[in-house]
Amino acid sequence: VVEGYGIIYNDAIMQKYFALDGAKAASMDEINNFAKLKEVVEDMQAKKDELGIEGVFASTSLTPGEDWRWQTHLANIPVYYEFKDKGITDTDNLEFTYSDNFKNIFDLYINNSCTAPGLLGSKSVDDSMAEFALGQAAMVQNGNWGWSQINGVDGNTVKAEDVKFLPIYTGVEGEENQGLCTGTENFFCINKEASAEDQAASIAFVEWL
């Protein structure tokens, strides 16, 4: 199964922001790179009371076992760009040349959250999705499976038509043309130590699936 993920946003809250005097953008179409995203997010955070939110981003869940959005999904972005620059698809030595870009978006999440940075270690993904569903936050990083989480929250205030996606911008040159992240994290593997007959049967089974 191929997954897609990015920054989920509540369009109702965004439209409310765009209508404010002095808004840093007039529509989501203008938010097509990190610089503009940062400008808008920081302005929204400053005007959170007017928008009726507790913070722009839902909690960056850092409870042990709940950090997969950052150590896998978000980390895929700098790794992708490093691989792209080197023309490779695998490596034994990751240089993390786009670490500053990773830090850009991670800091934006943490510093413009509905939860104080020092408390993020106590937050789970469920907490994060509940904050978004209850209208406490305007944005949350998650994937195309997110609606079931949002809709499953008791008291959900977000309409299905207001759940929309924005690419995860990090400040990489040319990111205006970047789309949502897509990929798969799980693979079937065949043991090379198995007999040739068993390997062939396994391949046939996977192809049948």
What are these regions (language model features)?
Residues I13-A25, K47, T115, A194-S202:
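Short helix-loop capping/hinge motifs at secondary-structure junctions, enriched
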Residues I31-K36, L119-L134:
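Short helix-initiation/N-cap motifs at beta->coil->alpha
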